[in-house]
């Protein structure tokens, strides 16, 4: 039986979050064993924040949750791709549909930002 290898990166694995219809990569985050299990059991994406050192469910503040459609692992079983239905307009905390809106062009990184919501309004603390 295949077991996910959480040891290579100190207990974490990269999780690539992809739109289940378009294939667009929405975000990349990290999971530990607990958050992967929470994701598999709840059908919503859960992650471990390295910055805040805590567990979080995608959309817990913004309402932009992700419904799990399919989960795959790679040949080394040390990362996962999670295909989701994005509930709400955006996956990125910046208000963009995807976290990948900065493109290498002409020798520099160029931002192609098109926020679908105002983060200052959504993340009031």
Swiss-Prot record:
Quaternary structure annotation from Swiss-Prot or TrEMBL? Homodimer.
Tell me the route in metabolism or biology where this protein functions.
Amino-acid biosynthesis; L-histidine biosynthesis; L-histidine from 5-phospho-alpha-D-ribose 1-diphosphate: step 3/9
Write out the entry's keywords from A to Z: Amino-acid biosynthesis, Cytoplasm, Histidine biosynthesis, Hydrolase, Magnesium, Metal-binding, Zinc
Q: Per the record, GO CC terms?
A: cytoplasm
- List this protein's GO terms for biological process: L-histidine biosynthetic process
- One GO MF term attached to the UniProt entry: phosphoribosyl-AMP cyclohydrolase activity
So where does Zn(2+) get bound?
A: 75, 92, 99
| One Pfam assignment | PRA-CH
User: EC no.?
Assistant: 3.5.4.19
Annotated localization: Cytoplasm
Q: What is its main location?
A: cytoplasm
Q: Provide the cofactor note recorded for this chain's UniProt entry.
A: Binds 1 Mg(2+) ion per subunit.
Among InterPro entries, the record links this protein to: PRA-CH (IPR026660), PRib_AMP_CycHydrolase_dom (IPR002496), PRib_AMP_CycHydrolase_sf (IPR038019)
Q: Quickly give the catalysed reaction.
A: 1-(5-phospho-beta-D-ribosyl)-5'-AMP + H2O = 1-(5-phospho-beta-D-ribosyl)-5-[(5-phospho-beta-D-ribosylamino)methylideneamino]imidazole-4-carboxamide
Q: Which organism is it from?
A: Geobacter metallireducens (strain ATCC 53774 / DSM 7210 / GS-15)
Function in brief: Catalyzes the hydrolysis of the adenine ring of phosphoribosyl-AMP.
Summarize where Mg(2+) binds, as residue positions: 74, 76, 78
* Cofactor(s) required for function per UniProt: Mg(2+); Zn(2+)
Q: Which family does it belong to?
A: Belongs to the PRA-CH family.
Tell me what this protein is called.
Phosphoribosyl-AMP cyclohydrolase
